[in-house]
Amino acid sequence: MKFNLIKKLTSVALIAAIILTGCAQGTQGTQGENQDKKTFKIGISQLIEHPALDASKKGFVDEMKNMGLDVEFLDQSAQGELANAQLIAEKFVKDDVDLIFTIATLSAQAAKQAIKGTDIPMVFTAVTDPVFSQIVSDLNVTDNNITGVIDAAPIKENLEMFKELDAGIKTVGIIYNVGESNSEVQVERTKAAAAEIGLAVETVGITSVNDIPQAVDTISKKADGLYIITDNMVASAISLVAKLAKENKLPTVSADGTHVAEGILMSEGISFYEIGRESAMIAKQILVDKTDIAKIPVQSSKSLEKIVNLKTVEELGFNKDNQAFKGAEFAE
């Protein structure tokens, strides 16, 4: 497929860039007036570019600057490939960065392996269950020089919105990447939460974004609505998912608020920008305050945002006054 060819070429180019440039494409933080003030070198390893993960990175960088730290950011994307994430993490270790900030589960798993035997701390975000994904062994007392902020969304509350939207919704569908442990966790949690409120769940696993059209078509024949978990493969093609769902008259609810701008009907979830900011605060504790990382528990964001796409409301024939939209911010 053309997409896969482009992906492979992009991955080759990325590997070459890492080797030849030594991750030199960083951005400089705000410089303090005191010339003796330490400049920290932070490696940012992002699994793939899409609005949610981009927002986490922006939140992290913005907050580091807001706190007045001098930081050189070494910013790399793995283009969705674990092999690239491993290369990036290994290069950061070779460059002796002061801290590695990872965005998404696979990037965190790769960095965990790379920092073994070093004193380089790692802060992760955009991970749903770091214990299940074997990034940390405990959420309260972290180990291996690793801590971070999880992106777990209020699954039960999101599912209840389907029932508020239309009492006729009895089954919701989920499309997910079978190779992402983050997604496996969410699928199981969604099934459990759905059972509590009397909803059935149909799932379709994918291995490529090229599988999405068929997956949506399959879901449309088995389910009354589509629930979007925080799956990076699905998120990278979220505008396509939204378009296909609307064509099939499937109401969509997402765990990620950034998806609403791409045409998803609604979301009540965490702010990826905020978990990026919260990760920066942890990084400051480690780098500046010299807090023992083992005493910094894995954190979860308390900041939720409820957003509704007004155009999608109209296209699907819902009333703006629907109970499900109560208290929401409407976006065009």
Task: Describe the residue ranges of each PLM region.
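Extracytoplasmic "Venus flytrap"
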Residues: 39-61, 67, 74-84, 179-183, ...
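Structural motif
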Residues: 72-94, 205-219
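Beta-alpha junction/loop-to-helix N-cap segments that form part of ligand/metal-binding clefts
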Residues: 77-137, 231-246, 250
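Flexible loop/hinge segments that line or gate small-molecule binding clefts
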Residues: 110, 115-155, 254-266
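Hydrophobic alpha-helical segments within soluble ligand-binding/sensing domains
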Residues: 129-171, 270-291
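Hinge/cleft segment of the Venus flytrap/periplasmic-binding protein
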Residues: 285-332
